[in-house]
Amino acid sequence: MKVAIFDAFNGASGDMILASLLGVGISEEEIDEVVKALGIDVNYSMTTVSVRGISARRVEVEERDGERSFKEVLEIIRSSNLEEGVKKNAIAVFELIARAEGKVHGRDYREGVFHEVGADDAIFDVVCCVKAFENLKTAGYEFFATPVRAGSGFVEFSHGKYPVPPPAVLEILKSSNLEVVMDGEGELLTPTGAAILSHYCKPLKPFPIRVKEVSYGAGKRETDVPNVLRLILGETAFHDSIVVIETSVDDLSGEMIGYAMKKLLERDDVLDAVIIPAYGKKMRPASILKVISPTHRSEEVAAEVMRLTGSLGIRIIPVHHRLISERMEEVVKVEISGKEFDVRVKRSYPGFRHLKPEFDDIAVIADELNIPPHVVYREIVRKIVGAENADSNGQ
């Protein structure tokens, strides 16, 4: 698995996130194309600077006074010719900010007016960052963030002086999984930075990685530590690290357990799930639900198991190794009772060890020919093995 880790040891803002992504998630030419597609009037520069001895990229945008309603910001994004994925996620980031500001000011977020966040420079930061994230996502990356340093003290906004973290930042954090550290001088985590990281990143949990690339995005202020956001690109050092998530339930009907299984198996982070009949306390009939998940997604899967079953306790069991044979699936033509059928067949390797026809295809043939499925199964295997033996003897 490819990972992109945002190490926000000194906070994060939109321009710092974008600067850290320069050259690894987005090129300068792509940024020019995004600005052209948006049709906004911004003056910006991209430079390399030294921050306390660390070489970092810096993106600077000329700030201008201006405000827009949430609807106006959406219209700018929707009317552009950017990819639909970029539009959708940029709108989602702005909606996070709008909802937070609406909650703080006690108004409908859809009718609100952005002040600093509605200016061209903020639109530039958000949409260019989203473009970079989408590029990395297409390349197979998943996104994580270390605990973000949020700052302390007070900060001036158009509405007046606010404590750090500002109320809008705290509202954004309420709806995200980001972890923060309430420390540092001044405002270190901005609403734009909080919204972008909240939308894309999961909290970083310990797992081994191989570091492939490191990039730094510089902030504007001088602080007691290097004012940079560190982006680490790498790959997990495990190939098949999994956990078994397990819980016992004795108060759900068969229909409810079946529904839970169905919803779990629809998730891309659930590799498999089984239900085992058991007896619980006082010899009550119960079910043990076992779910296999990648290690780095185990907390989300465990939370979903609790939500679907109402269970108050979940066991997460690390599995250090599981052996998976190499597999392939192919479609073979088989003649049965004078009719030819396409049958999907799974094989495992190395060598010819297992052969398994797809049961859905077996069922179709059984219904059409009005013969039992087990007869169809035997006939398919016999025909395939016979044909392969004939080919090998002919050679």
From Swiss-Prot:
User: Which GO molecular function entries does the Swiss-Prot or TrEMBL record give?
Assistant: lyase activity; nickel cation binding
Q: Do the record's keywords include 4Fe-4S?
A: no
Keywords associated with the record: Nickel
Membrane spanning stretches: none
Q: Which family does it belong to?
A: Belongs to the LarC family.
User: Which PANTHER family does the UniProt record give?
Assistant: NICKEL INSERTION PROTEIN-RELATED (PTHR36566), PYRIDINIUM-3,5-BISTHIOCARBOXYLIC ACID MONONUCLEOTIDE NICKEL INSERTION PROTEIN (PTHR36566:SF1)
Q: What is this protein called?
A: Putative nickel insertion protein
